[in-house]
Design a protein with these regions (language model features):
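Alpha-helical coiled-coil heptad-repeat segments
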Residues: 1, 92-96
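Short, low-complexity N-terminal regulatory "tails/caps" that precede and couple sensory modules
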Residues: 1-2, 9
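Parallel, heptad-repeat alpha-helical coiled-coil signal-transduction segments
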Residues: 9-16, 20-31, 44-87
Length: 96
């Protein structure tokens, strides 16, 4: 196996690891969003005493949404890298 093939395979393996990590981040983000919603509900039920907590819950929800948007963007970029690696692998196979 040539050095180029090893590099492509290693890069592809790393992209799979990154994809799994992005999935984990998405799962945590979803859980965080649910926790923020539950916290907001409880803050609302607490009335005046829960107003400060409602602000914190809203901020946590916003952070979760921001992380979700970043994760989606990274997924798009990672998919593009995988596509290019697939094309490169096919080109290398044809040139051998």
């Amino acid at each position: 196996m040539s050095d180029n093939n090893r590099i492509v395979e290693l890069t592809h393996s790393l992209s799979e690891v990154l994809d799994r990590k992005l999935s984990e981040i998405k799962a945590v983000t979803g859980t965080t969003r649910i926790l923020a919603l539950n916290a907001l509900i409880e803050a609302t039920r607490a009335g005046e005493a829960g107003k400060g907590f409602a602000v914190v819950a809203a901020e946590v929800k916003q952070v979760s949404e921001t992380i979700n948007a970043i994760t989606k963007s990274l997924e798009v970029e990672l998919n593009e890298v995988v596509k290019e690696l697939t094309n490169l692998t096919a080109d290398m196979a044809h040139s051998e």
